[in-house]
Amino acid sequence: WYEGWEGHFELVKLNLQNPAVVDYLLDCVKMWIEEFGIDGLRLDVAYCLDHNFMRRLRSFCEELKPGFALIGEVLFGDYNLIVNDEMLHSCTNYECYKGIFSSFNCMNLFEIAHSLNRQFGPDQWCIYRGKHLMTFVDNHDVTRIASILTNKNHLPLAYGLLFGMPGIPCIYYGSEWGEEGVKAPDNDYALRPCFEEPKPNELTDFIKELIEVRRNSDALCNGSYRNVVITNHQLIFERRTDNERVLVAINAGDSEFTAGNGELQGNFTELLANADEIENITLNGQLTMPAYSVQFLKAV
């Protein structure tokens, strides 16, 4: 018989319990690795895939190309079911996707702070500690972040949060310069335009800086997560490894704010300062946060 994914019959539902089907798919993967040198695969609607197939795919790819990444699209549920040592390396973090734009639009940073702590916090019950989920502010299936945010001053802040939080940051093409696009009820054409040429701007430069800072920070790439200061308009959290400690501070408000907390102590370097304007600051229980700002403070 013939089935389609969720009633879409142009998207055939394959029988992944049929050895011949599995062998064919693995041959396709092998071709793409050997002919084109791809480094990984994104598995669409991974929550629908047979678990034994994902186990077979994982072992096959690891033997063929060590370090090959398998990332699944998952919208809901427990990500641990498929992101583990036997199946996928990562999956899309839709819980925090929603939390990012909603926190800014509602001016309630408690929402994203709660989600991040629930997923990656210091307590043993936190559900995704040690995992690297794919994080994003938009993609080919949802309205672009520049069209969702009600205050455009929050656009760079959303990217600052994206690159400061745990996970694997993913940027959708065009959004690095703030392209807008609203998902229609019956099609996604507005989300997937053909650009004649790039449109780099200040947001692009800021994202490039975020990428460089994160790439060179073990704490931002691999560190633990812990909330330090939370208000409706401000959030300070800590990323830490044995060798590095970074405070990520976000002020979504339209005025300067001074955060007070006994943990805001010591000497820090502002990682997002320009190379010729490296700023060293000493905290004595307080941090002054400019309006609409993102700060990455590395303990020295």
Regions found by a protein language model. Name each.
Residues 38-42, 67-71, 132-135, 169-170:
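Structural preference for beta-strand elements that scaffold enzyme active sites
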Residues 86-88, 155, 166, 171, ...:
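Carbohydrate-interacting/catalytic domains
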Residues 7-22, 39-48, 103, 141-151, ...:
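The substrate-binding groove and active-site-proximal loops of carbohydrate-active enzymes
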Residues 113-183, 198-202, 235:
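Substrate-binding clefts and catalytic carboxylate motifs of secreted carbohydrate-active enzymes
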Residues 1-35, 57-63, 80:
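Substrate-binding/active-site clefts of carbohydrate-active enzymes
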Residues 17-25, 49, 53, 108, ...:
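Soluble or luminal CAZymes and related metallo-dependent hydrolases
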Residues 28, 34, 44-128, 161, ...:
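Active-site-proximal helices and loops of the catalytic beta/alpha 8
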Residues 25, 32, 43, 70, ...:
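Conserved, mostly hydrophobic/aromatic
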